[in-house]
Amino acid sequence: MVAKGRIIRVTGPLVVADGMKGAKMYEVVRVGELGLIGEIIRLEGDKAVIQVYEETAGVRPGEPVIGTGSSLSVELGPGLLTSIYDGIQRPLEVIREKTGDFIARGVTAPALPRDKKWHFIPKVKVGDKVVGGDIIGEVPETSIITHKIMVPPGIEGEIVEIAEEGEYTIEEVIAKVKTPSGEIKELKMYQRWPVRVKRPYKEKLPPEVPLITGQRVIDTFFPQAKGGTAAIPGPFGSGKCVDGDTLVLTKEFGLIKIKDLYKILDGKGKKTVNGNEEWTELERPITLYGYKDGKIVEIKATHVYKGFSAGMIEIRTRTGRKIKVTPIHKLFTGRVTKNGLEIREVMAKDLKKGDRIIVAKKIDGGERVKLNIRVEQKRGKKIRIPDVLDEKLAEFLGYLIADGTLKPRTVAIYNNDESLLRRANELANELFNIEGKIVKGRTVKALLIHSKALVEFFSKLGVPRNKKARTWKVPKELLISEPEVVKAFIKAYIMCDGYYDENKGEIEIVTASEEAAYGFSYLLAKLGIYAIIREKIIGDKVYYRVVISGESNLEKLGIERVGRGYTSYDIVPVEVEELYNALGRPYAELKRAGIEIHNYLSGENMSYEMFRKFAKFVGMEEIAENHLTHVLFDEIVEIRYISEGQEVYDVTTETHNFIGGNMPTLLHNTVTQHQLAKWSDAQVVIYIGCGERGNEMTDVLEEFPKLKDPKTGKPLMERTVLIANTSNMPVAAREASIYTGITIAEYFRDMGYDVALMADSTSRWAEALREISGRLEEMPGEEGYPAYLASKLAEFYERAGRVVTLGSDYRVGSVSVIGAVSPPGGDFSEPVVQNTLRVVKVFWALDADLARRRHFPAINWLTSYSLYVDAVKDWWHKNVDPEWKAMRDKAMELLQKESELQEIVRIVGPDALPERERAILLVARMLREDYLQQDAFDEVDTYCPPEKQVTMMRVLLNFYDKTMEAISRGVPLEEIAKLPVREEIGRMKFEPDVGKIKALIDKTNEQFEELFKKYGA
């Protein structure tokens, strides 16, 4: 009999109901009129305390609570792989089709598709005896993974019926088992399992087989075992954020600093505060501009975010852009290849001088902006007030801002070109129904229009009354206007205050207003014109030069230039040789079209104008005329790290990028986990995003499907299950997502697969436990976390393991758990980290200092540890090299000795050290740079097989031994440092042939022998 009760209290995600007699602990219930999904977590008499996995806003006392009689369970069967679920295993793609982009409350959908037919291949026959865990059939679920249909635990007997090979849905009965009691059990292709209950196994095996990841610092120094547990700290402080002074182009507020935008929108919706981070889900999304389908168009921003970053990266580009972002903020780079325009997202910390980042060249859209300006008109002739910003008003505005001023009762425009003043007067008559008077002063002519109302009108339109030269900025209305309106303003401004250098073929505008210069670059982008901005100091004041060059840019302003139109700013990175070969090398045809292909094959940069011609030959007109009219590849000329901590900001947009910066730049809204997911020799990957911010989770959902499985070349998603639980979802769902993920992992383990589960982040789960505990009024433990925090974390990690599975045949499967922890401010002493470290056996400590020095993976070898080294050494000794452990320990000793010596060097300098100790510093540096440092983006070095890892280590340690021998025989260290083999050792990581790496040992020995002879040692 199901329990039926009534709500008596609602406190956030917790609901208390009475009349729940007969209910059970951890029973799933439907709460309120909407039937929200909840779980009973406490029973007191007939009162039940329920944690609700959906938003409880609007749920009131008196509404019903109905039990389901079952505990929170997951469906396990074909259809799990490639799926994206929320914390309670609702398929997000299916729900999106039902309710749109936002999950409506009370909506459910089956976790596995009911109508899809799977190809079932039976593996037993009638009369066979089976027990729980036996495989009765197989389904090729994806091209990588075969799904094994198992007898559920607790069922045994004789097969009395088995389906023939064919297509079946998961609801069809595929087998019948007669139990010893005579009962017939019907088996389908899926089973349900309660998430809080461990799936059973025969025997737990010691974790003595390493989980090979191909990352040298992990496999050799801090190995993870199959069935083992590891923790890795997530990125501290902020995510992919920008400096508060970064300009953002918005429809509602014009060009505005992101920190000012945050102040305006802070709390205008659902606000969340989490330590030094806070964000608001906007009640009314605002309009920004972003890159979508090859164009820069209007997009919606749904969240604003403020956080803190311990350091920033400042980038300056050739055109004058200044970009200040967090080290892990992604910018865009790209190249044109035979496959089209390939855009890559690169973290700011991974960029270097000379790289080209994608910036905005053309911003699409615009409208006839309606003006709602009211001015007071008391006496005299009333002027007409325009109600729309059109070309004529924009032109007048250009004259006024360039050469005019607002006096208390007069609008004045100064210029010695009387025809220009007459044109402005003509416009004043047409627009405002008022005429001015042209007068001649001592040095300059002026158009004076006497009207206090007109002064007020322009003041409200954004023209400053005082110190205009230094304070003016482009009016918001102009920034969102149509291109023709923008063009009218720019041409008028240039006529007054621009200088055209016919020899250079460029227009220069000089302004004392920084905001005006940057606003100009955004206006020019509305016309598809890119600007170059330079600062110049006159006296003690800074002025800004806005330069427009290039034939096509000038043409867009109606200025013809005679002569060559090449500009070295608008360069297109092109794989010329690849495209030329694909074309069949038509040299003569290209030459007739004016394309000297050999110049570009020799390395000359191809301008955009030249690429437009080339594109016609290679069938890439769409790229030339669409994508590349909208973006520019801007070269980085300076990049530096700023170590001061500061507040940082971000916005969440539908395109996951937005246009911002001092000049229009494309800004993005993690590699270690991607490397583990791609390269670890686990067959199945489960990723749990537990309480992640929406934009971070979006990154994962977008990036994982793009990753290729390196072993098969197929999408990595074909062996992956994603569980997405974002920070703005109810906190109770974080716990459900953790248990859902581990249960799915155990299910694949039972098939005999090795599973890697990544939980990101367990810290946010712990925060949810703290909130629920507080609402339950439980006695708090350290820092407000519940007293049972340690046991909850241990319970989760203990479900990892390498086991002999249930079933008649011998199968071994494993679940390896890698949990991310996100300590506030990187504080490893806080309770979640400390309790995690008591349970896990591996800790990979990410080091921001290493990341700044571009050392990846940025795992600190002095603070990381692995307790599996002794457990996995037998596997390494038997399968790879019997000296693995001895070499690993010797290398660790060297690195630790280096750390001690560096302390001495800081005090007395390196020259005070004896030769032997300086030699240790030399070899330890080689060990760091040539072994520990690994390039995730290099085709060879991204994955290093065990045999290659050991061979590289042997080469380095042999060099160390020979160095020590040479020092003892009187050879100067400077001579050792100059040995040619050192350079070859530095390149060995990029060599796929292990035999060639091994040959470096003999080469090292030979070169040292020559040194010994030279010094008579």
UniProtKB/Swiss-Prot annotation:
Subcellular location: Cell membrane
Membrane disposition: Peripheral membrane protein
EC numbers for this chain: 7.1.2.2
PTM remark: This protein undergoes a protein self splicing that involves a post-translational excision of the VDE intervening region (intein) followed by peptide ligation.
Disulphide-bridged cysteine pairs: none
Main location: membrane
GO BP, sorted A to Z: intein-mediated protein splicing; proton motive force-driven plasma membrane ATP synthesis
GO cellular component term of the entry, any: plasma membrane
Keyword list, A-Z: ATP synthesis, ATP-binding, Autocatalytic cleavage, Cell membrane, Hydrogen ion transport, Ion transport, Membrane, Nucleotide-binding, Protein splicing, Translocase, Transport
Reactions catalysed, as given in the entry: ATP + H2O + 4 H(+)(in) = ADP + phosphate + 5 H(+)(out)
Additional free-text comment from the UniProt record: The intein interrupts the ATP-binding site.
Family (UniProt): Belongs to the ATPase alpha/beta chains family.
Name of the protein this chain belongs to: A-type ATP synthase subunit A
Source species taxonomy: Archaea, Methanobacteriati, Methanobacteriota, Thermococci, Thermococcales
